[in-house]
């Protein structure tokens, strides 16, 4: 699939699950944007993609390294193993709430080196989403950095959302959902994905061959893209009609005191 449609699919998945995740409106906006960026994250294994060109030679060099380690495009990063690596990395990047300092009485994080991994990752995701959607032009990188800093200030990336009996940083959830949406999208195409890499290189598909489509051809342009736009619009409309309540994590209860 094209980067634009990968970004839309990531945004759609987070918006569709927003009421289940119990996020408020501010966190919904951040989550949708982060998940849109994560929707193109697996393509960091290819140099000619929106995410690989987000920050010039820095991301291009990193892309070459990822491609070398993962076996090339649509291999390691397009597998269950790849989703796990991205998710674990983003979990630790977003988990600085556990030890990062707070501004007394405000609840926003004070400046700390704990912020750096999350700021870097969110800058990459925001910038990649903007590039994939052809928004922001040459200023997409600066907008991505600004968005990451704003997200940190509002504490959106600090939010721990309930997943079963766990409370997981929203950044990790957005990355996991976005990567999963990306792989599912590629499994609709003729190329498929080796989801059990490195144990197996067999390419899996979600549709029978007659229903599979080719990237950037008529089916994706005139059917898949409009469906994603309509689906995202309906999901956001649905979220707007339902109160989105952000639950407090056990740590937040303890910090608030009696």
PLM features: what roles do these ranges have?
Residues 1-258:
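N-terminal membrane-targeting hydrophobic helices
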């Amino acid at each position: 699939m094209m980067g634009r449609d990968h970004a839309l699919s990531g945004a759609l998945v987070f918006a569709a699950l927003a009421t289940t995740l119990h996020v408020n409106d501010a966190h919904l906006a951040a989550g949708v944007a982060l998940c849109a960026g994560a929707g193109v994250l697996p393509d960091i294994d290819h140099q000619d993609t929106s995410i690989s060109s987000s920050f010039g030679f820095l991301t291009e060099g990193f892309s070459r390294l990822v491609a070398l380690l993962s076996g090339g495009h649509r291999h390691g990063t397009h597998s269950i193993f790849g989703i796990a690596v991205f998710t674990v990395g983003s979990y630790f990047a977003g988990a600085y709430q556990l030890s990062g300092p707070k501004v007394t009485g405000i609840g926003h994080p004070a400046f700390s080196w704990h912020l750096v991994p999350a700021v870097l990752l969110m800058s990459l995701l925001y910038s990649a989403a903007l590039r994939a959607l052809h928004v922001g032009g040459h200023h997409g990188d600066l907008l991505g950095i600004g968005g990451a800093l704003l997200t940190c200030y509002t504490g959106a990336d600090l939010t721990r959302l309930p997943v079963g009996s766990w409370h997981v940083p929203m950044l990790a959830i957005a990355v996991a959902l976005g990567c999963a949406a990306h792989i599912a999208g590629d499994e609709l195409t003729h190329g498929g994905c080796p989801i059990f890499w490195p144990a197996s290189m067999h390419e899996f598909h979600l549709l029978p061959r007659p229903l599979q489509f080719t990237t950037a051809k008529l089916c994706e342009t005139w059917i898949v893209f409009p469906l994603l736009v309509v689906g995202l619009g309906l999901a956001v409309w649905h979220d707007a009609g339902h109160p989105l309540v952000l639950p407090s994590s056990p740590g937040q209860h303890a910090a608030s005191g009696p």
